[in-house]
């Protein structure tokens, strides 16, 4: 089972395309939708939905995937639910760059302070990070500097922030999922 979390643009047709691409790895791909506008509510909702899916799951090696803001959540929810994560161009600093787009961006900073202390150290090697060198929305170099101590970083030379085509990375993702 692969759980997919969309980014800020929840209505993007690219979400459906990514789900279809992920089905080449595992036919059981589940999209969880969330508001993107209310961080604390989103966290509760995502934890509840992922936990529900894991309770009904028969896959011994489930995976959670997210793009952009979905990558922010996939890393945290995956850690809290003890499943491996694959994150594409994760938005690690939504409290800095989501002002005016969401109701309370400061809630992201609050969530960060309430999360398990040093969670990335405890999550070491359980997350695969795929970054675009052509990310027009986020500073992928800053993201790499933040995460490379803990996770493998894979660079993509062609995709933009929304990462429309993940197919060149499917074999790597499948291998990572298999490690479970």
UniProtKB/Swiss-Prot annotation:
SUPFAM superfamilies in alphabetical order:
alpha/beta-Hydrolases
Give any Pfam family that matches: UPF0227
State the superkingdom: Bacteria
* InterPro entries in alphabetical order: AB_hydrolase_fold (IPR029058), UPF0227 (IPR022987), UPF0227/Esterase_YqiA (IPR008886)
PANTHER family recorded: ESTERASE YQIA-RELATED, UPF0227 PROTEIN YCFP
Q: Which family does it belong to?
A: Belongs to the UPF0227 family.
What name does this protein carry?
Answer: UPF0227 protein YcfP
